[in-house]
Structure formats: C-alpha cells, structure tokens
Amino acid sequence: ASRYILEMVIQQLPERRMNLKVSHPAYGFETIGVTEYDSKEYVARKKEYIQKWNLTAAVKEMKKQKRGMVIEPERQICVYIDPVTPDPFVVCIKNAVNQWGKAFEAAGWKNVFRFSSDKEDASLSYRTILFRWGSAYNGIYSSVIENPVTGEILCARVNVMDVAADELLGMYFLQCGLLDGRIRKDLHSLAVRQDVLTAQVAAAFAEVLKMKPNKAGYTVFTPADIRSEKWLNRYGITASITSGVTFNYLAQPGDGVSVKNLFPRVSAYDYDAIRYAYGNSDALPSMRGAFYTPEDKLDPYAQDGFLSNDILNASIQGVESVKKIYPQLNGWINRLPEDQNTWKNVSDFAVRAQSLFQTYLTQMVKLVGGRSVRPIIKGVNETLVTYVPREQQVGALN
C-alpha cells in the first residue's frame, strides 16, 4: 500500500472592486470572457477582459495619477524569495523584478513590489509572489491563481534554479564569445550565469503578469540598431522580453557593445502593455512592429531565436560569426580551467558550432514561402496576411 500527504490551500475570493480593462489585439494578455446584458436594447454582448493584478489607491491619489503623477498602491505585492536561494541569484531575481517595476512606474505606479524572505510571508496568500529555489530542472516554472470572475491575479509561485541558466551557457559561448571574455575564461562564469538568469527570470515574470509571449519582439529592431550601443542602452536587443531569451549574436568586436547589451531585458512593448493594463492610457504600442504576435511556424518574424527585422542579413552575419569562431575553439578551450580543458569539450563545441551554422541556414529558409498574419486594426493594419517580398525569398535561395 502507498501513503500520500496532500496539501490544499483554500482561499476565499476577496470582495473588491476590480477595474476591468478590455482586451485589445495589439497586446497579448490572458483574458476572461464576460457576457454583458443590455436591458434597454435586450441584447447580450460578450467581451474579453485582461487578467491582471488589482492595483488600487485612494480617490485623491488616483486623481493625482490622472494628472501624470506617480503614486503608490494601497497595498504592495509581496515578492517572497526563498531564504535558501544563493545570494548571487537573489540579486538576479530582484534585478529582474525591478525591471518590471520600472515599467509599472512608467504607468503611474511606484513601489509596486516589496521583497521579503520573512517566514510570515512564505505562504501562497493574497497578493504574494513566491520564488522557490528548486524543482526547476527543465526551466523556470510558474503557476498563477486568478479570480475566474473578475480576472484579478490573486497570487503566484515561481520555481527557479540556476540550472536553467547553465543550459544556455554553451550557446552564449558560441554566439557571444568574441565579445565577452568572461565566458572564454570560464564556461561556468558566475557573472555570466547571473546575467543569463536575470534575463530568464524577467521573461518568466511576464507569465506572473499573465502576459502572453510576443513572438514578434526580437524581429522589430534593425541589425544596425542591435549593433548600436546608444540604441541598446535605451531599448536593449528586443522590443519584448516576454518570448524568452535570445542573445545578441549580431554585435561584433569593434561595435563598442558592452556585455550588458548582449542580453535581453524588459523593453518598449512591455512598457506599453503595462501602461495599457495598469495606467490611464489606451494607446497602441509605440513601435508598430511590436504589436502582439503569437508563435506561427509559417511566419519568419514570429520564431524563437531569430533576431532583427532583416532576417536574411542577420542569418548571414550569424554564419560569418560561426566561421570566425570555429577555428578558434581549440585555442579557447585550451585556455579554460583544467576541469573544462578537455577533448570532450572540444568535440562537443565543434558539433554545437556546426549545429548553430545549420540553424542560421534554416532561418534563411523560413523566408521562402513565409507569410505573416496580423489582426485587422482600423487605422493601423488593414491587411490580414502579408507575404515575404520576392527579392528576400530569392536572396535566401541564393
């Protein structure tokens, strides 16, 4: 016979007014469907409202916010960080959450999140986000509890470990090794692992905010933008962190790009989406190419791992980078610490480099017959389907 211990948390839904926000196709949020009945016209209309945290303040404070002032919510969202989390990675979690905190501040709310490792905050209770260290061997995992009636996010849990970052270090070594000496000195560089994990937590936190992955985020900026330190300091390498982590493989030695700009972060679309959901704005995304786009295998501009709005030239640049790195792999690995300086690593990275080369070629192939489907939005987009221009398809074949 087997014996099990089951734990159950039962929460009474709070009796609070929720400021509902109608869903808009330009922004990707999880939604609830509400059927509204009009007793005057005797008609029923179904509307979609986004799921979000309920930020409230006194009427007097809300008036200040409408005048453009930044205010604090009546009750902050507690971000509990498991005390067993190693100190270097506590910093990663805080930095990632603070990136989103700045987006909320731009929407008119300051000090939305407060950090805690106190025992009394360790329960999955109302307006709490628990960061637990462990049970994240296959990537950062999150679960969210929401009110099915109002769409209010009640609490959330995120399981995180540095194992998630370790899995990307090999890719970072190949894509950014020419620019980041830290990874050439140590394949397990703590500083690099921190940078990778910060980006991963920032991406995962979008799920806690019930934001859908915007697969168009990485294909908004031009290759020149992504190689410009000035541009990167302002926007980073993607218009949205929501679709996961891709590194800046377009930057080259001589571009003057700092290592911090080799990683994605919360950016323009994310700020616009938070402003739409929590601020006083109904504006569309500030960058037209950043409108919400779900994953589409036939759309070359909605794929994981693609970078820039010029996929052909970006892929060619990626191929050229692999050609530069491949002959240097043996020398790089010979200069690594003794436990990493092995023939197995030489062999493994040679195979990975060849696989990366093939990945860039596959990106070019995606242009052939590629098409993009975008929602019809009056005054913005009135064409449902657009196809990759003929010259780009021919260029990919040549």
Predicted regions and their residues:
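Conserved catalytic/binding loops enriched for acidic/polar residues
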Residues: G217-N398
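Loop/turn elements at helix/coil->beta-strand transitions in domains of secreted/extracellular proteins
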Residues: Q76, W109-N111, E152, A239
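Zn2+-dependent metallopeptidase catalytic core
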Residues: P86-V112
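The catalytic-center signature of Zn2+-dependent metalloproteases
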Residues: S117-I140, D195-Q252
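Surface-exposed helix-capping loop/turn segments at secondary-structure junctions
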Residues: F104-F113, E207-G217, K366-R371
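Auxiliary tRNA-acceptor-end handling modules of aminoacyl-tRNA synthetases
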Residues: A1-T85, A103, S117-E167, Y172-R193
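Soluble non-cytosolic domains of exported or imported proteins
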Residues: A44, P83, D87-N95, A191-V196, ...
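Divalent metal-coordination and catalytic microenvironments
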Residues: W100, G151, K210
